Amino acid sequence: MATKISKALLLAMLMLGTSLVMFAPPADAQAAVAYSISFTNGQVQLDVRPGASGIGCTEMVISNEGQATIDVDISLSGGGVTISPGAVSVTLAPGGSITVPVCALALTRSSYKTVQVNALASGRETNTQLNQVNKNAGFAVIVQQYARLSVQASQPFQKIGPGKEFVLNFIAVNNGNYQDTIAVEVMNAKDLEDAGFTVALAAAQYQIDASGEQPVQLTVATPRGTVVGW
């Protein structure tokens, strides 16, 4: 006999932080404890971009492979993410199985990382609570990387005369959740060069840590014999 728990129930539990206790109809104990525990998906991806849920789910399958009715207690843990349910207790008749949705939650803008979730199970014969058998299984949770960048000028407006060279300073900010490599270019460089300006970047690309800032310099030389004011 197989039992399946709805994801709607599990997501409600994710907010309440409760444990899950389930029961499948028992039968008379006939033999030693034998069971299996597995996950239907070995990897769960979490989207933690602003506006995303940060939630990803898989399913845990517990099957009684013996001839005795058994009690199985399972604890789940994963550093850096919230796992729900954190504990599951089931009673399974011989040949019975149960499928339990298991969800992981990471906060919005969490750092990019991979977390291993471990499920530790302890199974015993129901009537005597003897013949304990321990099992373990697990899955990986990947907090996905995302990139976001903002740029601002140190001086939004600057006035200089003809035939002069000056340096424009910008600040690039990595608003993503991991180190990013950014490429820098002047979008209207050709128009400026056609007008007689010389434009030079201090560097074509930079590496910026998450939440880090990077100064970006641009050197501009104005053409000679032109009016003041750019």
Located regions from the model:
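Secretory targeting signatures
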Residues: M1-A32, M60, F170
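Long beta-sheet-rich domains in secretory-pathway and surface-associated proteins
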Residues: P25-W230
